[in-house]
Amino acid sequence: LAELQAELASKDKAMRDLKDRVSAALTGFEGKGLTVEQRNGRIYVSMENKLLFPSGSYAVDAKGRELIVKLAKAIENEKELNVLVEGHTDTDKVHPGGGVKDNWDLSVMRATSVVRIMQESSRMDPLRVTAAGRGEFVPVDPADKAKNRRIEIILSPDLQELYKLVRD
């Protein structure tokens, strides 16, 4: 039990330290549609779409690319970190054209655009990175469409060592 508690404490400290490094790397973006929070043993980097994409598009603009590259560089050496990039949309219908069928499709394509930039600009292990789309189904605030249009990057520690300790 003591070994398990020590491993848990070590993971928690590592995540706090990582949150501080991520926040430091993204200084200048916080308060402008970006938040970095630690909850439930994970780090959540939430970016409003205005920081990344033109309306209805999944092409990341120059300022968004700068933000994503800074984040990727800040976490590229974290070998025991899983990275989930989630795209979220509002409930407005997507305009036909541009290869986007609906909000779910748009959210996946936006998440994939972010993952591609992270991969191109860093040494992150692609086996640890996942792109996912949540469409309009997980709103932050149903009354605030702008807040719901976002990318969330969820950084989770690899818990295999903890599982091994529990089994043994």
Task: Locate each region found by the language model.
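Short Gly/Ser/Thr- and Asp/Glu-enriched loop/turn motifs at secondary-structure junctions
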Residues: Q38-R42
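Extracellular/lumenal/periplasmic "stalk" regions immediately C-terminal to a signal peptide or transmembrane helix
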Residues: L1-E37
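Short amphipathic alpha-helices and their capping/turn segments at secondary-structure boundaries
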Residues: E30-V36, V69-N77
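Short, aliphatic-rich beta-strand segments
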Residues: I43-E48
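Periplasmic OmpA-like peptidoglycan-binding domain that tethers envelope proteins to the cell wall
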Residues: D12, L52-K70, E78, H88-R167
